[in-house]
């Protein structure tokens, strides 16, 4: 299976079912009271994070994913069936975008996000009966479901991200730290996809995940090499470990890594420098690097030297980061409710254009082939202040008014 970390497709919620116009019928009551039921809501397209997937490969060729349509209402106040939801499993660590920006970050197993909500079912005529209007003969149409193009971007979730130039020994270090068995070789970009390993030792507070991220080269922040695909996965690690080849200009390698992380806006991330391949150095050079990189662990992934001490150091650093995160304030939760506020009336090409979420929904729900339904629509416009807003804007008898895709004459 290919490692695909990006996918783009259209999601479409199901249309809501139409309400019914029906009257109760029984012996001696040939035209009883209204009993038309409402239409069922359309199904939604829902994304769900799971640990059972590691790639977005299953969505790489999908173009449109649609949920089910709601059933129409019927007599005896029977509501239509709800449309079938479509649940799309995605790997933990998937970010969801549309043209406006980030919509969701699915960072926990089981976390869900409604990518396209189904349309609301229309009310049947039973819902419009009042003491003054005892036999309404109109209903509402179901609303269309939401539709948008989304882009999924997978960023591997890890506690520790190993970053370094090609052949710095990251894959060997991952293998030494954990039970992971990545490919290892002496050529650029041995690792073309992120590799994960779990470090689990007796006495640790909890196991932690280490990711070997594809090798970084100068210019990655501008798209060179594996470019932004590398940086995407680095951004999710809680602690970055800069793995330097101690035998090949470690000072220059650190400068390159710091510069690329800084250009990508990642310079503020918690980090630790590790000198690898120290088994290739003599005692004098080791001492020099100890002064040039004070506090940096010196390890050899090949011989295992210093690897145990490094694992314990990483575990301590992660615990410190957890304590800092627990002390940070949490953002508040905001709830948005539909409102008739924000209604706009504008003049456009000789017509008065009315815009606003609720007034556009009302127009979509109206059955324009039913005169009673049109009268109800006009009464709602008057009651909600839309007609008053049109008059204040200068609308007069016979002027064209547009609401969404609906056009009618002002009266």
UniProtKB/Swiss-Prot annotation:
The protein's required cofactors: Mg(2+)
PROSITE patterns per record: G_OBG, OBG, OCT
First-tier enzyme category under EC: hydrolase
One protein family per Pfam: DUF1967
CDD domains noted in UniProt: Obg
Nucleotide-binding as UniProt keyword: yes
Domain Obg: from-to ranges: 1-157
Ranges for domain OBG-type G: 158-330
Domain OCT: 335-411
A single GO cellular-component term on record: cytoplasm
Alphabetical UniProt keywords: Cytoplasm, GTP-binding, Hydrolase, Magnesium, Metal-binding, Nucleotide-binding
Binding site for GTP: 164-171, 189-193, 212-215, 276-279, 311-313
Gene Ontology terms, MF aspect: GTP binding; GTPase activity; magnesium ion binding
Binding-site positions, Mg(2+): 171, 191
Biological-process GO terms, alphabetical: ribosome biogenesis
EC numbers for this chain: 3.6.5.-
Assembly, per entry: Monomer.
Family, as annotated: Belongs to the TRAFAC class OBG-HflX-like GTPase superfamily. OBG GTPase family.
Protein name: GTPase Obg
């Amino acid at each position: 299976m290919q490692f695909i970390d990006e996918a783009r497709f259209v999601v479409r919620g199901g249309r809501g079912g139409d309400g019914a116009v029906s009257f109760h019928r029984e012996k001696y009551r040939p035209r009883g009271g209204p009993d038309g039921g409402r239409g069922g809501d359309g199904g939604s397209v829902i994304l769900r994070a799971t640990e059972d997937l590691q790639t977005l490969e299953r969505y790489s060729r999908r173009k449109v994913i649609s949920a089910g349509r709601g059933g129409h209402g019927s007599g005896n106040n029977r509501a239509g069936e709800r449309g079938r939801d479509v649940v799309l499993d995605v790997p933990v660590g998937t970010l969801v975008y549309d043209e406006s920006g980030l919509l969701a970050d699915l960072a926990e197993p089981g976390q869900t996000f409604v990518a396209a909500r189904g349309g609301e079912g229309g009310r049947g005529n039973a819902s419009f009966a009042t003491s003054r209007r005892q036999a309404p003969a109109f209903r509402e149409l179901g609303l269309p479901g939401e539709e948008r193009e989304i882009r999924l971007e997978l960023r591997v979730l890890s506690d520790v991200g190993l970053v370094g130039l090609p052949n710095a020994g990251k894959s060997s270090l991952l293998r030494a730290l954990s039970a992971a068995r990545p490919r290892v070789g002496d050529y650029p970009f041995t690792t073309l996809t992120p590799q994960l390993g779990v470090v689990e030792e007796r006495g640790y507070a909890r196991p932690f995940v280490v990711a070997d991220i594809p090798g970084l080269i100068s210019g990655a922040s501008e798209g060179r090499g594996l470019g932004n695909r590398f940086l995407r996965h680095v951004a999710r690690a809680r602690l970055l470990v800069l793995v330097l080849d101690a035998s090949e200009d470690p000072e220059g390698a650190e400068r390159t890594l710091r510069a690329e992380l800084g250009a990508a806006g990642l310079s503020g991330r918690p980090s630790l420098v590790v000198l690898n391949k120290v088994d290739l150095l003599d005692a004098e050079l080791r001492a020099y690097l100890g002064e040039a990189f004070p506090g940096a662990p010196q390890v050899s992934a090949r011989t295992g030297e210093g690897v145990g001490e490094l694992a314990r150091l990483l575990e301590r650093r992660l615990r410190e980061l957890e304590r800092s995160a627990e002390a940070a304030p949490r953002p508040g939760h905001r709830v948005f409710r539909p409102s008739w506020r924000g209604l706009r009336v504008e003049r456009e090409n000789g017509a008065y254009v009315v815009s606003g979420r609720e007034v556009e929904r009302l127009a979509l729900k109206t059955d324009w082939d039913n005169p009673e339904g049109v009268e109800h629509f006009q009464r709602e416009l008057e009651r909600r202040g839309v007609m008053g807003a049109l008059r204040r804007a200068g609308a007069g008898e016979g002027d064209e008014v547009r609401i969404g895709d609906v056009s009618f004459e002002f009266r």
